[in-house]
């Protein structure tokens, strides 16, 4: 039976990644971008301990405004349900819940990885990417991370990284880096073909589609590095670590850049949702035009 073209979307960007009302507006825009491509968006989250595969607009607004929303990876899913909490799903939790619901395509902003100056702080996202068969569309990984170590971790954990219409790893707010990708795909159909072969071979793990931010929205690497260094130093001074670190750094980057990073973040999220919609449609057709 032909599967419906469904795209999973995460909710951490709603509850912890963007300020109100930008968070709500961006979540709705991402869903609309998926629909424009002929696919069905499903934003995931947990409301009062209940898993929601497809939040309503009212539920999205609730997560966007509510206080004390848990930020959960795969490790915290069970606790959020058992304790009847409101929870926003990160990349790892969204992947696990989406796969359990039979969804194969997921769009996010950027994946987590290894933090700068804290090499033992490695995101659950990498472990989930190594285990769960899914197509994950992102703009690379967040530029606040240790780029080289994150690339090495992805390779060690056998995550298939595919540059979309690029030979270089994009870095979230920046279109390109000096780090080459081993695999390039130039169409949704090529991505689906790789996914189908992995399925046939029974190889675990995701295909991480690195989709560069649109050129008109990117921030020059040198300029961005200045903001990041300041934000990382401030996090260290304030003793911020763990799950609080990424939201803190992204918030500081918005302030330090005069809102440039926020504008870039929104642009890449919408761009990734569009590509994921195209991939989901291609997958539902079997990967051929």
Curated annotation (Swiss-Prot):
Any Pfam family matching the protein: Indigoidine_A
Keywords (A to Z) from UniProt: Glycosidase, Hydrolase, Lyase, Manganese, Metal-binding
GO function terms (MF aspect): hydrolase activity, acting on glycosyl bonds; metal ion binding; pseudouridylate synthase activity
Signal peptide: none
Entry cofactors: Mn(2+)
Cited function: Catalyzes the reversible cleavage of pseudouridine 5'-phosphate (PsiMP) to ribose 5-phosphate and uracil. Functions biologically in the cleavage direction, as part of a pseudouridine degradation pathway.
Subunit structure as annotated in this protein's UniProt entry: Homotrimer.
Annotated protein name in UniProt: Pseudouridine-5'-phosphate glycosidase
Species whose genome carries this gene: Kosmotoga olearia (strain ATCC BAA-1733 / DSM 21960 / TBF 19.5.1)
Gene assigned in the entry: psuG
């Amino acid at each position: 039976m032909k599967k419906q073209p469904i795209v999973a979307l995460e909710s951490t960007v709603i509850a912890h990644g963007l300020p109100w009302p930008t968070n709500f507006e961006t979540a709705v825009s991402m869903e609309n971008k998926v629909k424009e491509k002929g696919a069905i968006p499903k934003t995931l989250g947990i409301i009062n301990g209940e898993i929601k595969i497809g939040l309503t607009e009212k539920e999205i607004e609730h997560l966007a405004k509510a206080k004390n929303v848990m930020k959960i990876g795969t490790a915290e899913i069970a606790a959020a349900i058992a304790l009847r909490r409101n929870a926003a799903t990160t990349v790892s939790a969204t992947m696990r819940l989406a796969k359990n619901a039979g969804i194969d395509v997921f769009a996010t902003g950027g994946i987590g990885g290894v933090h700068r100056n804290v090499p033992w702080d490695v995101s659950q996202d990498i472990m989930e990417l190594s285990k769960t068969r899914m197509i994950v569309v992102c703009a690379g990984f967040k530029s606040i991370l240790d780029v080289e170590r994150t690339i090495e971790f992805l390779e060690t954990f056998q995550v298939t990284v595919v540059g979309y219409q690029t030979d270089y790893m994009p870095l979230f707010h920046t279109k390109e880096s000096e780090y080459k990708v081993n695999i390039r795909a130039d169409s949704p159909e090529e991505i689906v073909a790789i996914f189908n072969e992995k399925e046939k071979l029974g190889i675990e793990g995701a295909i991480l589609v690195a989709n560069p931010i649109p050129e008109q929205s990117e921030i020059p690497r040198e300029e961005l590095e200045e903001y990041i260094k300041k934000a990382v130093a401030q996090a260290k001074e304030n003793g911020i670590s763990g799950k609080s670190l990424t939201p803190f750094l992204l918030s500081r980057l918005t302030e330090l850049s005069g809102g440039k990073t926020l504008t870039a973040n929104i642009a890449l999220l919408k761009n990734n949702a569009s590509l994921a919609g195209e991939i989901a449609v291609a997958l539902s057709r079997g990967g051929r035009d």
